[in-house]
Amino acid sequence: MGMLAVKYQIGLHVDCCLGGFVLPFAKKLNYKIPDFDFSVPGVSSMSLDTHKYGYALKGTSVVLYAFKELRQSQYFCYADWTGGECA
């Protein structure tokens, strides 16, 4: 898929929400895990749920971007959220 993303100059998002925090350690233990991260040409973003195996609070997640230009489009402010301001 990474080769297609490069060929057609489109973004490739990798959903690592389940296992994203475990897979790098499994690779270090010599499990045969295919490359899935920014080492794959064409991968432009990844998501990880920190509340699953990252031991963070329920509902927290992380989005990682390969390029700053992609990240700049992500920011928003929503003041009517019941938990307060979210930015």
Task: Name the predicted role of every residue range.
Residues 1-26, 41:
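Catalytic PLP-binding core of fold-type I/II PLP enzymes
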Residues 13, 28-87:
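Active-site C-terminal subdomain of aminotransferase-like
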